[in-house]
Regions:
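A short, amphipathic edge element
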Residues: 38-39, 136-147, 196-201
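N-terminal mature ectodomain segment of secretory-pathway/periplasmic proteins
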Residues: 32, 37-112
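Gly/Pro-enriched, hydrophobic low-complexity segments
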Residues: 115-118, 138, 156-251
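Boundary at the C-terminal end of the N-terminal hydrophobic targeting segment
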Residues: 23-27
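Acidic/charged, solvent-exposed loop-and-adjacent secondary-structure segments enriched in E/D, K/R, S/T
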Residues: 110-136
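Bacterial N-terminal signal peptides
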Residues: 10-21
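Bacterial N-terminal signal peptides that target proteins for export
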Residues: 1-12
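Solvent-exposed coil/turn segments that connect beta secondary-structure elements
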Residues: 61, 79-81, 89-91, 104, ...
């Protein structure tokens, strides 16, 4: 009798191990696993942008229900997710304006002003785009991540994470972040204010190979406070560059073209 029980238990165990549902349950991430959540955000950061030095151009188009589209273009130099230079190239009336980010510190340099102006990352740059959306993309360094759940978007299994700001210098107080499980591609983000008000939703789109791996080359920002306003960021000409640290200094900016 006991031998039969042992054999039955062995058969049941084998069935559990090979059932698809059991495999999914084993692979399902435990909610609240901080180490796993941090790893997911780090990997998604590397999908969005290289960790090494790189250059790219960004075109931002903003549309509203009652006005013509506004188009602005920028040249971006970035290194290590902590140092960024953003140069305005269009419109011509703003050409020569430069943003310099070092860590969480951001300055704007204007051709007509001798001293740089300190700016917050959360301040609006244009349309639904904040300074930090363009100058800083270091979610892993700016937020503490918690894995909330998994769900599907367009049939793709995704992690759903809650990102909480490490301090008040970062662009947003809280972010809900959807990342595809199969390849850590970011899918969507919702950005919230300190008062927990939804500010905007970002959709990561147009995945193409650029600078060594497949990345989202278009971001669509949907303004939650201005329902008729939408901004798209189109990335182009992304390439790796050896950028010396001296580029990311106030004294060097006048030499940039």
């Amino acid at each position: 009798m006991s031998g039969s029980c042992v054999r039955l238990r062995s058969v049941l165990l084998a069935l559990v191990l090979i059932l698809p549902g059991a495999s999914i349950a084993q692979d399902a991430p435990p909610p609240g696993d901080e180490a796993l959540a941090a790893s997911i955000v780090q990997k998604a950061d590397l999908v969005r942008f290289p960790a090494e030095g790189f250059e790219m151009t960004v075109t931002i188009n903003t549309t509203t229900a009652d006005g013509p589209a506004d188009t602005r273009k920028y040249r971006v130099l970035s290194k290590g997710n902590e140092n960024t230079v953003v140069m305005t190239t269009e419109p011509a009336s703003e050409r020569g304006q430069i943003l310099l980010m070092k860590g969480h510190d951001l300055w704007m340099f204007l051709p007509s002003v001798s001293q740089p102006v300190r700016l917050p990352l959360a301040q609006r740059l244009t349309g639904a785009v904040a300074n930090g959306d363009l100058a800083r993309a270091n979610f892993a360094g700016d937020y503490t991540a918690q894995l909330l759940r998994t769900e599907k978007i367009d049939g793709e299994a995704t992690y759903v994470l809650e990102l909480t700001a490490v301090d008040r210098t970062v662009t947003y107080h809280r972010v809900l972040y959807w990342v595809r499980q199969a390849n850590f591609w970011p899918q969507k983000a919702e950005f919230y204010s300190l008062s927990e008000r939804l500010l905007k939703t970002c959709l990561y789109q147009k995945f193409e190979k650029m600078a060594g791996r497949v990345r989202p080359m278009r971001l669509t920002m949907l303004d939650a406070l201005r329902a008729d306003e939408e901004s798209t960021l189109e990335y182009a000409d992304m390439r790796m560059r050896d950028l010396p640290d001296k580029i990311f200094t106030k004294d060097y900016l006048k030499r940039l073209e």
